[in-house]
Amino acid sequence: MENDDISSKNNLNPQDQLNYKNKAKNLEFVKNNSNIKIPYFKEIISDDFENIEEILEEFSKQIIIRSNSSKEDTDETSSAGKFLSIGPIDKNDISLIKKSWNEVLQSYEKDDNNTVIFQDYVDGAKSVSVLTSYKVGTDSPYRTFSTYYGSQTDAVTSGRYNKIKNFFIHRSLDNLPEKFKEYYKFFKIQNQLENLFGNKQLDIEIVTDHKEEPLLLQVRPLMGKVIKKEPIMVERSAIDENVKRYKELITTTDDRFGTNQIYSNMSDMNPAEMIGKKPD
């Protein structure tokens, strides 16, 4: 499957790529270096408190206040879900916004930063999905797409809903079969982000709007069990070698009936299963 062109990918500084301590910076990086659509967002600092009404004029009718803790992710661990995100909130309800803002900050640790993310709430969402580059918590090299079909944008991450559809695809596949075309948009965005960040262990949250257009809510490093890439490649090599050997042996011979060779590790133990001119 083709990856869309990423305008400034060749000029990216590795130090500017995947940020473990600031989800807002990751979104900003994607916005500036790709064509992936993102609901309008802004990183809010404590100094913005006094002119919050002016800032909110830039947003749609409702917003989500998302955590942006510097302790949420490190290069070894993740605290995904530990810190609050609150919404949707009417952007004109200033008192509730300030109250919710403080509640999100209070969920942080004492020596944490004091920023949050204000993001447009996607009203009338068709679905929300979490895409992971690998099966979480395992060595399994499977892309995982977990989707909830409904407007609850926290359905997958909150753990409060059980009607979630999971789709797995092995990382060795570069294209999706036609029958799985509903997942094309997820596959495409995941590839774009992995290439953009130069990182193939990502945790991505996507929502589809009322037009079924995918919108990126957040992207973060995928934490969990370290992927043992060498054993995976050894396993793949063994499979490839066996396939090659089978193709060499599949050619029919004059002393056997039929047009296809079928191999078994039991037929030599049961004469009744040995079919041919000379069962010896």
Feature-to-residue mapping (PLM):
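General beta-strand structural signal in soluble alpha/beta enzymes
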Residues: 38-42, 64-67, 116-120, 204
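N-terminal auxiliary "cap/dimerization" subdomain that precedes the catalytic jelly-roll/cupin core
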Residues: 36-59
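Short, flexible beta-strand-to-coil junctions
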Residues: 69-70, 122-123, 149-150
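Short, surface-exposed amphipathic charged segments that create phosphate/polyanion-binding patches used
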Residues: 52-59, 77-82, 131-134
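Glycine-rich phosphate-binding loop of ATP-grasp-fold ATP-dependent ligases
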Residues: 40-41, 65, 69-96, 127-130
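Conserved ATP-binding module of the ATP-grasp superfamily
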Residues: 55-56, 60-64, 88, 92-121, ...
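Conserved divalent-metal-coordinating catalytic cores
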Residues: 1-35, 43-47, 75-77, 95-101, ...
